Amino acid sequence: MTQNIRLAACALLFGTWAAAASAQGDTKRGEYLAKAGGCLGCHTEDKKDATPFAGGRALKTPFGTFFGPNITPHPQAGLGKWAEADFVRAMRHGRRPDGASYFPAFPYPSFTKIDDRDLRDLWAYLRTLAPSNRASQPHDLGFPFGWRFLVTVWKWFFFTPGPYVPAPGISDIVNRGAYLVQALGHCGECHTPRNFLGGPKRGRFLAGGKGPEGKDVPNLTPTGLKKWRDSDFQDFLVSGITADGDVPAEAMGEVIRNTTSQLTPQDLAALIAYLRSLPPLPD
């Protein structure tokens, strides 16, 4: 009887510890998720010896220039005073701690689909970063695009909050690929054409066109991938070199260096399987 009580007590203690560890988040998983989400590219200034995640990267768009903010845990310049709930609100609902909406240059229309566990682990990882006191640079937007209240109207038309729900009737690998593409990888933010309001064109998901900075981006539906073998495409997403020896434009080159080359072979295979499953759309 005593032995059974001891075993039960140990099990209870272990279960409590495991639950607490889960609640705190897995920083190792979070680091992988940060790579899958491309956080480094948007939140690190484009210059030699820039401090990672300290902000300053410029995104030039037809609406003006947006600057990625400091997301290190510095108490004044970064996210040091944020609670996990503030982070979840930003990612899931596109709102600042004070309730104001973020401009959708921050791809929360995609990040809203990240599930609760991944948000927790990603937050845990961001808390481990070295704090930087680099002040976040204000956006430089043309009239009237700097009026933040207009984002609320934009959201009514183009934003649906909520985590990704696995689609029935398709394989686990395709669902995993859909999650990587639609949520973490936010591929549609660049590869889906947009209307004059900056909203994604309905029915044209991943069909290519002009990216956020006005440059041509390719069609990722089977129409655009028909000349690629899976093995060649996977090699390209790791090495940044096509089977013909070509290299991509700098923007995609950075995505490959910081994101796709860091994915596991299983996740790369899932990503490709999902893209292959999409309906082919014309360029």
Task: List each language-model region with its residue ranges.
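Bacterial N-terminal signal peptides that target proteins for export
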Residues: 1-9
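Bacterial N-terminal signal peptides
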Residues: 8-17
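Electrostatic cytochrome c docking/interface patches
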Residues: 19-35, 152-182
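The canonical Cys-X-X-Cys-His
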Residues: 30, 36-46, 87, 122, ...
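Electron-transfer interface patches adjacent to heme c in soluble/periplasmic c-type cytochromes
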Residues: 58-89, 109-119, 204-244, 254-268
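Membrane-embedded segments
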Residues: 94, 99-103, 107-124
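Extended, well-folded interaction surfaces typified by the phenylalanyl-tRNA synthetase beta subunit core
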Residues: 134-151
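A cross-kingdom marker for long, charged
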Residues: 249-283
